[in-house]
């Protein structure tokens, strides 16, 4: 801020000049003292300059409403919404989210620095404040087949971007524990730049938590129980309570939060599909849920705003007070988080669920639009030989969780080959390398999916984003793979050799180039098509499928090299 603007702001605060905007007659939330203030709020040049009695060029009468800070999502992969940052803004701003901290490691795993820069530039077009953490593990583990590999030297120049706050979720716990050279350099570079380091401590022991804290990792969003949360807080970490489309952990972790330690907790969505964001909400859903579960409402709102701001060093966000950014919302019902108006930098950006700003986007480079290079798959490529005298090692999904279980199941075979058994809900799963056209694919078995006929497939397969499919028969699995190759990436449902619906994701096989409302409509059509497969369970099968390829979350996952035991960090045979 230059001197003259600084002088002007002080003059408005001192009431020598009228403010551009004054919110009048609302109850104003004081997140510091956790109480209500009866006062006007004056805004000038996107900044709150006063609380008290003020006159404004524009005065908004908010009688009967409450003015609360805008919400902050502390950890989100925008790519999981399947729309670009500018379109993502349209989905979350009406839900009171004014700031997000994003980790673009999905697009980085496919398109490297080119993908990260696309997200950075498009984010500048959004009304939403979008900050970035730099992907720390591309690929997630060294043996993964991703579309890019990012070393410390690749990331270091990006710290000069003002939107970059730090190093994103450090998943490679082996690299940290063994103090591997490049991982050490990534951690040290973040420290030297005085940046925050996010963690990913899924299933880690106390010993490894100590290792992570010694490495200056300050947050974790992979907590699934109250006890895990307390162990991390005890060691000085911030804990994010997560509620996404698959991982739903708020209710289980919430008992850890009390008046003494609440400042170490805040909310995140991590991975949430666009249709869920638009229908259920974002951080507003988590605040609403926490209040319903018995958390003090002031603490819930504080966790939804101030706590995340303080964790990430966003010193002018998260509160309604002089000197803070004018990012706030009016709510008609405090406990139910009924939002009527949302303001970012003092501008009305959403009202009664309608997003106000025009949307500007940038054109993706041709490299981002040509990302699916999978080989042609034949039935013999995905054949899975088994014998009738040994149990099969199977991935058992846990609905609405990212973790899985290793299950031993009696053989399901015909002529020495595995065949899917819908009666026992045991299905074939295939993961095809799609970045370099390699003849490398993992074939395994998964239980608990609930598909009775056909197959589904997606090029969103965390974190390397190869092409993953699951189905009741080989022909439909292959048809689903072919459909996504033709579409240049996306999500598809196939039954009896016919593609029932495909959502194309042409940008790196992860993002649509279409407006949010059209993507939302396509997602609804996709879920209608899912019903034709007999799926009727209470979880998102596409996101569940996509996380079965992430070999850093226990217990077992699939890689292009086969079944992988995460805890013991080794591949497993299908039968043993």
Curated annotation (Swiss-Prot):
Keywords: Hydrolase, Manganese
Keyword Manganese: yes
InterPro entries from the UniProt entry: Adenine_deam, Adenine_deam_C, Amidohydro-rel, Metal-dep_hydrolase_composite, Metal_Hydrolase
Record-listed E.C. numbers: 3.5.4.2
Cofactor: Mn(2+)
A GO biological process held by the record: adenine catabolic process
The organism's place on the tree of life at top rank: Bacteria
Annotated family: Belongs to the metallo-dependent hydrolases superfamily. Adenine deaminase family.
Protein name: Adenine deaminase
